[in-house]
């Protein structure tokens, strides 16, 4: 049976010294050998506390920590500034860059029959279980997969095997997992620890990762009474159970259920963290189950200056926009470039309200024409900032001087919000 090491709870605030002590216990329990690989997330998961954990591990392990491989997926590499900010004190010489095009080993395939069943007969292909060559063939005695369990639009609850199979995976695996989640339905997945995408990852973890010396180190992060982020939980284990324990706490900490569906939600995107709609549309994903039919979502995004994280995806977003599921599926059928980039197709589906509510974007680095060309309503950044008195807003319900009542979200990537009638747990746990 998988033994779980865990600390914290829904009201806990784990201090750095407690976390360092817990990490020392994890290393003592599982053993380190002489070669350890750490796989943390990249800067887009800055608030996961994984950077500080990696720094603590480097202090505890010394020369035994031989490699740090940020789980980039298809994101751009971590810059020197991002690395120094997120991983304080960790030598630059330890960092490796995942290239999802070339640095891959295929460990096996999830059979097409299972994909067909999980997708309700919408998809008919196998799923390749791929990881970075350093994970599969690096000769490490211990692989520490580090990250935050938090509600997620593709996989329901982020992390565990996703960190390796998607974060250090290849194009086909990333594209197909995203597209599976999109065709099954994002609102049927978000916040649920079990769903078709997680079932695929669990199958791959149990059948293809089990022989690797992987230990998952998982955090749960929540806001304290003063709105500051706190580490609520820390979990470690080799199998699936540590993920389910963390997901249970994350649902308690990161999920907000509202009885009344807001007519207007305003979300802020930190300009240091969000530079594209590819990442910034988490404001849409995480709030969509809360917004009233015919309502509005206003996204304040001063740092957003592009759509995609790479030129190819940016081009597809500009070509097709966020027009809803039928239009996107038609593009997949008619355009070979879109058919080859199913993660872009999934992103376009996720980023549409399907006509249910209006999405208004105040993007600091995109023109009005650019914003409106993809199907959003464009707003002026400075006017919007002033209109909504951003300096005075608190998370949750606010009454503006104009008399308008809005719901404000300052960190959409760290939670999930839903109106009670829109959240139903319908998928059985995979084992």
Residue spans for each PLM region:
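Glycine-rich phosphate/diphosphate-binding loops that line cofactor/substrate pockets in enzymes
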Residues: 22-37, 61-62, 137-139, 255-264, ...
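Short glycine-rich or small-residue beta-strand-to-loop segments that form or flank ligand, phosphate
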Residues: 35-46, 69-73, 145, 265-268
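Histidine-anchored nucleotide/phosphate-binding helix
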Residues: 45-64, 280-291
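C-terminal catalytic subdomain
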Residues: 274-368
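Conserved, well-structured core segments that form the ligand-binding/active-site neighborhood
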Residues: 96-97, 101-261, 289
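Extended hydrophobic packing segments that form well-structured cores
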Residues: 13-20, 354-431
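Long, charge-dense
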Residues: 67-116, 321-340
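N-terminal amphipathic/basic leader segments beginning at the initiator methionine
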Residues: 1-18
């Amino acid at each position: 049976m998988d033994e779980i090491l865990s600390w914290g709870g829904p009201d806990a605030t784990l201090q750095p010294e407690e976390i360092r002590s817990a990490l020392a216990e994890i290393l003592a329990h599982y053993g380190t050998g002489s070669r350890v690989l750490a796989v943390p997330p990249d800067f887009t998961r800055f608030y996961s506390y994984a950077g500080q954990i990696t720094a603590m591990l480097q202090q505890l392990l010394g020369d035994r920590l031989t490699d740090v491989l940020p789980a980039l997926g298809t994101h751009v590499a971590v810059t020197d500034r991002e690395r120094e900010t997120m991983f304080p004190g960790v030598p630059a010489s330890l960092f490796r860059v995942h290239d999802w095009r070339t640095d891959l080993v295929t460990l096996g395939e999830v059979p097409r029959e299972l994909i067909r069943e999980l997708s309700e007969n919408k998809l008919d292909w196998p799923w390749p279980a791929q990881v970075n060559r350093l994970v599969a063939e690096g000769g490490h005695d211990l692989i520490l997969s580090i990250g935050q369990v938090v509600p997620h639009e593709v996989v329901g609850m982020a992390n565990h095997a996703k960190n390796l199979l998607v974060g250090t995976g290849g194009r086909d695996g990333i594209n197909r997992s995203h597209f599976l989640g999109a065709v099954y339905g994002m609102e049927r997945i978000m916040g649920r620890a079990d769903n078709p995408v997680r079932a695929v990852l669990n199958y791959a973890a149990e059948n293809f990762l089990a022989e690797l010396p992987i230990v998952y180190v998982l955090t749960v992060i929540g806001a304290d009474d003063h709105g500051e982020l706190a580490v609520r939980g820390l979990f470690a284990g080799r199998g699936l159970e540590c993920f389910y324990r963390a997901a249970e706490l994350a649902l308690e900490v990161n999920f907000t259920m509202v009885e009344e569906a807001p007519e207007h939600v305003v979300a802020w995107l930190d300009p240091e963290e969000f530079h594209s709609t590819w990442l910034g549309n988490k404001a849409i994903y995480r709030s969509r189950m809360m917004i009233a039919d015919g309502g509005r979502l206003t996204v304040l995004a001063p740092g957003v200056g592009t759509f995609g994280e790479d030129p190819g995806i940016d081009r597809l977003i500009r070509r097709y926009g966020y027009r809803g599921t039928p239009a996107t599926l038609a593009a997949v059928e008619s355009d070979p470039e879109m058919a080859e980039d199913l993660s872009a197709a999934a992103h376009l589906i996720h980023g549409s309200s399907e006509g249910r509510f209006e999405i208004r974007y105040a993007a600091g680095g995109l023109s009005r024409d650019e914003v409106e060309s993809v199907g959003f309503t464009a707003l002026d950044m400075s006017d919007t900032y002033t209109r909504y008195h951003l300096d005075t807003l608190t998370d949750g319900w606010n009454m503006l001087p104009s008399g308008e009542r809005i719901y404000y979200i300052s960190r959409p990537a760290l939670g999930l919000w839903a109106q009670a009638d829109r959240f139903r747990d319908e998928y059985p746990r995979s084992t």
